[in-house]
Structures are given as structure tokens and as C-alpha cells.
Amino acid sequence: MGPTACGKSQLAICLRKYLSIELISVDSALIYRGMDIGTDKPSFSDLYNHPHRLLNIKDPVENYSAAEFQKDVLREIDEIIKLGKIPCLVGGSMFYYNVLLHGLSILPPSNIKLREYLIQKSYEKNYLYKKLKLIDPISASRIHKNDFQRLIRALEIFYLSGKSLTELKKKNNYKLPYNIFQFAIIPPNKEWLNNKIELRIKKMLMLGFQKEVEILFLRGDLHKNLPSIRCIGYRQMWEYLEYKNSYKDMFNKTIHATRKLAKHQLTWLKNWKNINKIEYHSTSTILAKKVLDVLEKNDFSV
């Protein structure tokens, strides 16, 4: 775990030198095919040598729910264990990790008409977030005000069931049937992380991110309300292609949104239980050594 641009993927790949592990991606953006540059997906070479499960499993026009992730990731974990190997989950989607660790309550299925209404209301600035804050302040504190997919789902659950997401979660008796070790890479300071994020976005644009989004834009079956196109970077570039902002605005808004995401990820990690926090280092082998030291102290054997 860890905020964006902290080297999670490189560390996971490095750990394969020392441990018999199989990698599982825990990232709500990396699931989409054809969205490689803007999601900072591992290179073709890295994926060939170090396959990641739950990566490139959906077309951008498709939705992917937290319930689907829970089912898929538990299946992948079970398959890896049956192979006699260790599942290693890597990514920055903190909500997905939370679902894996604590489960989901039995929730009402989505209602098309209600969802369409809430999507329309999402165009009103902060409407969804303010509404959820009144209904379910605990859930609102855990969901970013621009995370429309989760805000809509939380409101949808309340309107359909009459109970808040927080209330329903209290009735959840789910327990993960595995012994787990949790690690998070922590950046040295805010300024360092902000600089890393800006450098990543500049590199992304140099690698042809605009062309990648243009290909999606010209398909004709995608729109900006889809979860895939709401991914950071894609949403801003999409608006640029619609002539709704300048190239400079697109660049600055992408940096701003990515920094907010990193802040949100660190907020999750601040209160995360039973986690081993590892200070960032530019050399993956040094980070791997820190992970191995923790495992050794806990009598972990391969």
C-alpha cells in the first residue's frame, strides 16, 4: 500500500527475487484495457516477467463494483495458495483493501432510474457530498467529494434501503480467513511527494497520454460519467478534448487531482490498523530488505 508515485509496483516486483509470490493488482484504474500511460501501468516487459492478476480485466465501457473485486480477489488468493505460493497484493485503491479486509454488507442492487437521477445531480457542485454528509457523515468522511461513483452508491443504498451504509456495515460478520502482513510505503514529506507527482504527470504526457485518451474519445461509446473516464488524468484530458479547458488547465488540474488523491490515501493509512509503515527509498532492494526484516521478526517462512 501507499500513496501514488511511491514505488509500490517496483517494490512488489523486487520482492519476487526473495519470495515465492504471485502479484495481484489492487487498483481501480489498472483494471481497464487500453488505459496504460495515464494509470502508470507496469511496462509490457515487467508484466511479461511479473504477471499481475486483476489487471486489464475490463473494457473502459464496463463498470466494476467493489463486490466484484471482493469475489475476484478472494478467488485469486485461493488459486495462488493452492499453487503453493504467496499472494502479494499491490496497489493504491484503499477502498478495495478495506473491502477485502472487512467485507461488504448485503446491499440493495443498483436502481437505474435512481442512479440516473443522482448522476444528473452530480453536475451540481458538491451536491452529492453535502447530501451524504447529512445522511451518513461517517461514510462522507471516508469518501472524496469528487469520487462520484462511491458517493452515488452510498446515497443509492440509503434511498433504497432506508439505512445508511455505515448502519449496514455494522451488521457485517465477514472475516478474512488468512494470516496477513500489511505494508505501506510512506513518503519522506509532502514537498517530495508533490514533486514526484508533477514529474510523473510530465512523463505521462511525454509518453503520449493525449494520444491514448484521443483513441478512447474517438470510440464513440465512452463518456465522461463512466468510472473509467472519471479516473484522474483521463477526466481532465477528456475535458480538454471537448474544448472545455486549455492544455495548461488540463495539466494543472491533473496535478491538483493527483495530489488530492495522494492526500486521501495517506489519510486512510494514518488510521489503518496493523500496518508496517516503511519510509520511502529510491532503491527497491532496500525497501524489500525492510519488508523481509519484518517478516523474519514475525517468524514468517516461505
From Swiss-Prot:
Chain segments carrying region Interaction with substrate tRNA: 27-30, 149-153
Record's keyword annotation contains Nucleotide-binding: yes
Entry's EC annotation: 2.5.1.75
Keywords associated with the record: ATP-binding, Magnesium, Nucleotide-binding, Transferase, tRNA processing
Cofactor: Mg(2+)
Role description: Catalyzes the transfer of a dimethylallyl group onto the adenine at position 37 in tRNAs that read codons beginning with uridine, leading to the formation of N6-(dimethylallyl)adenosine (i(6)A).
Quaternary structure (record): Monomer.
NCBIfam families in the cross-refs: miaA
Protein name: tRNA dimethylallyltransferase
Record organism: Buchnera aphidicola subsp. Acyrthosiphon pisum (strain Tuc7)
Top-level taxonomy: Bacteria, Pseudomonadati, Pseudomonadota, Gammaproteobacteria, Enterobacterales
